[in-house]
């Protein structure tokens, strides 16, 4: 189990700290440190659970950055730098931090929200509304046609980078319906034989990505104006630049390539 969620830390276990300074996360030797920066004032300290045998804590730096070993990195570069085993811990901390910062007042009556002692949610002492960390489900689909994969790029992607199709689930919509809708809207293609692959919590800012592989079922590629800059079919031995290795898109594309090669063997 990646996370255990007791109410109190286990005193016999070591610690891991996610200390933020604005949009920056503090790392030591490219890892989440075992203790916060020495001699620094912290705010928002919170126990987030047990992850990989360590008590996980969240805090924000108050004042200037400490002049000591380590570096402050934006979240994406920090996730790339740290061991894969710690990525999920940092993602949890980033998502909960965003929730704590954005849910300070009741959206119903504007009363300051109270922190719950036994859960991560916050409640309104005036009207009784309860707020929990937001999770936004989104699907990702990799469309296969023989040994070719349909990859696309959005205008905000790094130059030369392509990825699988993705989009948020609409209210009242199933994941499967979202896959069919997004592939049609984004590239004008129909799909069939959907297969669930895996999922990933993605803290930009609070997505839960659910990845699928689907087979091509017709249609000519027609990139959606304003959303898709380019799209095309790519042979698995001639892929363009791909998303960073920690992303579910990278894992999904590599997984599909491996499956195709296994079938060809």
Swiss-Prot record:
CDD domains: NUDIX_NADH_pyrophosphatase_Nudt13
Binding sites annotated in the UniProt record for Zn(2+): 106, 109, 124, 127
Motif (Nudix box): 167-188
Keyword entries, A-Z: Hydrolase, Magnesium, Manganese, Metal-binding, NAD, Zinc
Residues engaged in binding a divalent metal cation 3: 182, 186, 227
GO molecular function, one term: zinc ion binding
Binding site for a divalent metal cation 2: 182
Cofactor binding: number and manner: Divalent metal cations. Mg(2+) or Mn(2+).
InterPro entries (alphabetical): NADH_PPase-like_N (IPR015375), NudC-like_C (IPR049734), NUDIX_hydrolase-like_dom_sf (IPR015797), NUDIX_hydrolase_CS (IPR020084), NUDIX_hydrolase_dom (IPR000086), RNA_Hydrolase_NudC (IPR022925), Znr_NADH_PPase (IPR015376)
Enzyme Commission designation: 3.6.1.-, 3.6.1.22
Cofactor(s) for this UniProt protein: Mg(2+); Mn(2+); Zn(2+)
NCBIfam families per the UniProt record, alphabetical: PRK00241.1
Family (UniProt): Belongs to the Nudix hydrolase family. NudC subfamily.
Entry protein name: NAD-capped RNA hydrolase NudC
Species: Chromobacterium violaceum (strain ATCC 12472 / DSM 30191 / JCM 1249 / CCUG 213 / NBRC 12614 / NCIMB 9131 / NCTC 9757 / MK)
Gene name of the record: nudC
